[in-house]
Amino acid sequence: MVNAVSRVRRFVRGAPLTYLWLTVLLATTVIQRSVNRHHLHQFLVHDSTNIHDLATDPLAVLFESLLWIDGRSWTPYLVLFTLFLAPAERWLGQRRWLTVGLTAHVGATYLSEGWLYLAIEYRHASQHLVHTTDIGVSYFLVGVIAVLAYRIATPWRWGYLAVLIAIFGWLLIAAEDFTAIGHFSAIFIGLMFYPMARRRSAAVGSRARPDN
């Protein structure tokens, strides 16, 4: 039991940003549960990466949208962060991990909202979606999940990628909304970091190799 607790502590200490972020998300989830629906809507719209706020205060909303989860259940994020974000942080290091995740978050946000903007301009979507609620950590998460493919040896890597693309490809076809476009885009943004992942794998491998 003591050994298990010690291993958990070492794992958490090896991914401090992941678990600090989870702690913040736990706090904001408590806030979501404690306020009424009207005030919650005001909170979330204020921190949303929608077309209006990206045009008026992009840096603030791109950061603040990462502090909320899209839903009221925190436990699934604990599982997903532990399965994907924490191992990626331990492998890539904090700076590279942030680079991948934030690039996916920002890139997928602008791609999805750009698609929505065009849909509104061509009257394929309602004008009120300019102020839609768009918060959450999923683009960051999907981008990091994608780059983790480079941590997996072939041929298993291709199976991992096939499952990932199949899941979000099906959601793209079934949902046909801007968030599905964002998730699908985040996969390929994450995969663009192959050169960085390759260098990191080589560095980790050289440290693990015993001296002759």
Task: Describe these PLM feature segments.
Residues 83-101:
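Membrane-interface helix/loop boundary segments of multi-pass membrane proteins
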Residues 26-31, 105-114, 163-178:
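Aromatic-anchored segments of alpha-helical transmembrane domains
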Residues 2-45:
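N-terminal signal-anchor transmembrane alpha helix
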Residues 127-147, 182:
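Membrane-interface micro-motifs in multi-pass membrane enzymes
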Residues 61, 79-86, 141-147, 162-172:
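Hydrophobic, membrane-inserted alpha-helices
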Residues 175-190:
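Loop-to-transmembrane alpha-helix initiation sites
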Residues 33-84:
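N-terminal TM1-TM2 helical hairpin plus the immediately adjacent luminal interfacial "cap"
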Residues 100-107, 157-170, 186, 190:
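Central hydrophobic cores of alpha-helical transmembrane segments
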